[in-house]
Amino acid sequence: MSFFQKNTSLFARLGYFISFVILLLLSLIGVEFFVGNGDGIWFDYDLRLIGFRLVAWAVSFVVLYLLIRNGPPLLQNVLLSLVSVLLVIYGVEVVVGWIHDASQKSTTSSLPQYAGPAYDSSYAFDEFLGRKPIPNHTFWWTKTLKGKPVVQIGMKADSFSRRITPFADSTHPKRDKYALFFGCSFTYGDAVKDNETIPYYFQKENADYQAYNYAFFGYSPRHALARLQHEDLTKQVSQKQGIAIYTYIEDHVNRAIPSAGWIGMYDGYFPDLDESTMKTTGVYRFVHPIKYRFGMMIFKSKVRQHFAMDFPFGYRPKDYELTANLIKASQEEYKKQFKNDNFYVVVYPDLLKKDSPMIGLLKERGLKVLDYRKLFPFPSKQYQLSYDSHPTPEAHRLLMEQLTKDLKKVGGVSGMTN
């Protein structure tokens, strides 16, 4: 007992705490090894990670205390100011969190509480894309009310993780052209059936084309570029001639940057980009762990959620430039693979971007741009799903009907101009 009485210094107490944490976690890990599967995770809690964090925080607090108490005056003042600022930020976050949670409860209490869809069951990990549709899999897009499905839609993916585009007329004898579609959930067809997507309606309007859907939930220009840089799509497409279409919405700028909101929404699982070479180099959360952690902190902030803020706070000229450069790089990669320049950017109707410079930037880079912003109002009740914020099948149909007309005006893909 005399040993513990003599060793009562701060460092000794820190050592006792660390030893206690290690012994406790070793005991829990030992129990989990015999009663669980031996992976160190018990009831979804990673015991090793918890132990590391406890020790790391304890050491950090002790070091901070010693520096404030015994450090030079300048360092003491800096650290005290920093701690004060952090405490104020934390206090504001807590208070705004209470207000936000209360307002959310009052807003939703009188509305039907729908659950789903469970997007986590729709994708698999990919070393360059971050996430991709599970190959040869049907994802059931389901919304439930009081535990019962109210909307249930099957979304089928093929062996190349492309959403299957069924033929409107399976008896057509010859489809000798391809149409590659890149984009986000608008193109993939969030909340609509396989025969209600953008690629489907294009294929229905153009019987000599076979459409291939390379889009997915939450995709961005980064994903289109990564797919073209790391996959040989000519080996996935049987036709030798055709076109590629990238469907653009203004939110793709968020994803190109990426903004803190988008880092959080996609949990950092999207392609990283070397802007100097325009090469995709892996998955963002693993290449930039510090930026990823910082982005997640902002994303989870109650202040950000309550005031609907993001970081950066608005689109900067360089953000638009980066987005345009990404789409241009995708066009160049497409041209390398398919040996033609039939790459078009379709600008989806979107009332939120009247002053966007994107169309001008794309045209400056020599891209073929089809501006459909005024084709129909979106978002609007007429063209927005009642059970989701995405476009209706009718909106997709109208868009592809207009695209078909524009292609026919110039005699097909070879003569299309921007």
Describe the predicted segments one by one.
Residues 386-418:
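Histidine-centered active-site loop/cap adjacent to the catalytic His
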Residues 203-204, 212-217, 222, 351-393:
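Extended hydrophobic/aromatic segments used for targeting, binding, or gating
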Residues 102-125, 219-314:
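Interaction-surface signature
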Residues 15-66:
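Membrane-embedded alpha-helical segments of integral membrane proteins
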Residues 100-200, 204-205, 376-379:
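Membrane/wall-proximal cationic-aromatic binding patches
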Residues 181, 240-253, 303-377:
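Conserved, well-ordered alpha-helix/loop/beta-strand core segments that scaffold catalytic motifs
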Residues 3-21:
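N-terminal membrane topogenic signal
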Residues 73-99:
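Internal/C-terminal transmembrane anchor helices
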